[in-house]
Swiss-Prot record:
It catalyses: [thioredoxin]-disulfide + sulfite + AMP + 2 H(+) = adenosine 5'-phosphosulfate + [thioredoxin]-dithiol. One of its GO terms (cellular component) is cytoplasm. It comes from Salinibacter ruber (strain DSM 13855 / M31). GO terms for molecular function: 4 iron, 4 sulfur cluster binding; adenylyl-sulfate reductase (thioredoxin) activity; metal ion binding; phosphoadenylyl-sulfate reductase (thioredoxin) activity. Keywords: Cytoplasm, Iron, Iron-sulfur, Metal-binding, Oxidoreductase. This is Adenosine 5'-phosphosulfate reductase. Pfam families: PAPS_reduct.
Length: 252
């Protein structure tokens, strides 16, 4: 399927974005990614935490445009299994896996902010170790691919396939927005792709070790177990500055 491709205006009008979203909705993620790679070329990058959705997209990108940049935000607090999976996927798939780090060590953060900031002010911790590094990395990009899906949480239920992210100055592409968790796992198994073994140990979603716990029984959302003792569901990467109790106001 060939979609309209005109990259002269940035950001594009809301009317144009709505029209493209309407075009994308009935088509599969590979068609959307094909449009994205042809439209944005080297100015495109996928961000992933190596969850099932991200791995599906990595596999598709390796086929559509080998060498595409796939980056992950290394907070220094990821599970050992996540780092191992990263290395495995880097060897298996023809994409350019890139580590993004904010440059602030955990010791330096403790000196500046106090010990275990993630327990006292998780929004501030997420800003320093995730949001700020992401902003810096995307500064010279035009488009960012994510694995966000509508069925992951109530907050994500209205996710568009294509949107303009003003806080980062890029177009955000969610090719799996209308896929279900079942479809994602079906794709993984059909293509014999690896996944994080922690998913078999009661972890629906994996982030940083201190802020992620297993759950006894999931309620259908794949982001359960994140900040389970708090009224917090997002790290701030996919929310506006006004969301999450002013998560991004934590930068001040």
């Amino acid at each position: 399927m060939a979609f309209a491709s005109d990259e002269s205006a940035s950001p594009w009008s809301s009317t144009r974005l709505a029209a493209l979203n309407a075009q994308f909705e009935p088509h599969g993620p590979k068609a959307i990614l094909n449009w994205a790679t042809h439209t944005f070329g080297d100015d495109l990058a996928q961000g992933t935490g190596f969850g099932p959705s991200g791995i599906v997209i990595m596999h598709m990108l390796a086929d559509l445009r080998p060498g595409t940049t796939v980056f992950y935000l290394d907070t220094d607090l990821l599970f050992p299994e996540t780092y191992e999976l990263c290395d495995d996927l880097d060897e298996r798939l023809d994409v350019d896996v890139t580590r993004v780090h904010g440059g602030l060590s955990l010791d330096e953060q403790a000196e500046q902010e106090g010990e275990e900031l993630w327990n006292r002010n998780p929004n501030r911790c997420c800003f320093l170790r995730k949001v700020k590094p992401l902003r810096n990395f995307l500064d010279d990009r035009r488009a960012w691919i994510t694995g966000v899906r509508r069925d992951q949480s109530e907050r994500r239920a209205d996710t568009d396939i294509l949107s303009w992210e003003g806080q980062y100055g890029v177009f955000k592409i969610n090719p799996l927005a209308n896929w279900t968790q079942k479809e994602v796992w079906k794709y993984l198994f059909e293509h014999d792709l690896p996944y994080n073994p922690k998913h078999d140990q009661g972890y629906p979603s994996l982030g940083c070790v201190p802020c992620t716990e297993p759950v006894d029984q999931a309620d259908g959302y794949s982001r359960e177990g994140r900040w389970s003792d708090r009224d917090k569901t997002e790290c701030g990467l996919h929310t506006s500055p006004e969301d999450e109790d002013g998560a991004h106001a934590a930068e001040s």
